[in-house]
């Protein structure tokens, strides 16, 4: 497997791999500095949309991935999301992805957030998966933490195999195929 360059990412985006797509790095908006997004040398920095689900323990329930209680989240829409101390929030990317059959995509958090104790977690985007990426932001600090909608939050790295997989995510009818919006756990 080899990592794909900015040139490859731009060509793949022309075919609809990333929508909307930014061909370069955006670092300012209306003269103000932002957490960057867009194409980098060997990756694509995604933006966080303005839809959030903030985890709360008001129901004092057990967190069970096989039987997740949607009441454990408070829905929020806005330009800035405040994550409570030692808690987390779910969000989604602005971008919609269509991953090629020969490609596996790995997501890593941006250092701007990591250096503040905010960790971004996303599982790999498998071959032929498509949808908005659900992002998990963990606030590891004892203080409230800010997430900015419309700005960069994580980087996607595209790895292309020298051999096409026998069975893709679409082939096996993956449960998150075509997801739109913030998607909660499914079994």
UniProtKB/Swiss-Prot annotation:
GO BP of this protein: dUMP biosynthetic process; dUTP biosynthetic process; nucleobase-containing small molecule interconversion
UniProt KW keywords: Hydrolase, Nucleotide metabolism, Nucleotide-binding
List of catalytic residues: 136 (proton donor/acceptor)
EC number(s) stated in the UniProt entry for this protein: 3.5.4.13
Record-linked SUPFAM superfamilies: dUTPase-like
Biological or metabolic pathway of the protein: Pyrimidine metabolism; dUMP biosynthesis; dUMP from dCTP (dUTP route): step 1/2
Protein residues bound to dCTP: 110-115, 134-136, 155, 169, 179
Reaction(s) catalysed by this chain's protein: dCTP + H2O + H(+) = dUTP + NH4(+)
CDD domains in the cross-refs: trimeric_dUTPase
Pfam families: DCD
Alphabetized GO MF terms: dCTP deaminase activity; nucleotide binding
Subunit structure: Homotrimer.
Protein family membership: Belongs to the dCTP deaminase family.
Function per UniProt: Catalyzes the deamination of dCTP to dUTP.
Protein name per the record: dCTP deaminase
Lineage of producing organism: Bacteria, Pseudomonadati, Pseudomonadota, Betaproteobacteria, Burkholderiales
């Amino acid at each position: 497997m080899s990592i794909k360059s900015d040139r490859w990412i731009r060509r793949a985006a022309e075919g609809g791999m990333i929508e909307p797509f930014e061909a370069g790095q955006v670092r300012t908006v209306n003269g103000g500095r932002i957490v960057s997004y867009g194409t980098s040398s060997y990756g694509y920095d995604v933006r966080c949309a303005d839809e959030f689900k903030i985890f709360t323990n008001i129901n004092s329930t057990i967190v069970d991935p096989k039987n997740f209680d949607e009441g454990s989240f408070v829905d929020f829409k806005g330009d800035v999301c405040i994550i409570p101390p030692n808690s987390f929030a779910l969000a989604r990317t602005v971008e919609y992805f269509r991953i090629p059959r020969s490609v596996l995509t790995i997501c890593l958090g941006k250092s701007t957030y990591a250096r503040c104790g905010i960790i971004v977690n996303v599982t790999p985007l498998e071959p032929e998966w498509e949808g908005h990426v659900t992002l998990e932001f963990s606030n590891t600090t004892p203080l409230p933490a800010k997430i900015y909608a419309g700005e960069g939050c994580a980087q996607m790295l595209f790895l292309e195999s020298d051999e096409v997989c026998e069975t893709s995510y679409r082939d096996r009818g993956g449960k998150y195929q075509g997801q739109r919006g913030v998607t909660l756990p499914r079994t």
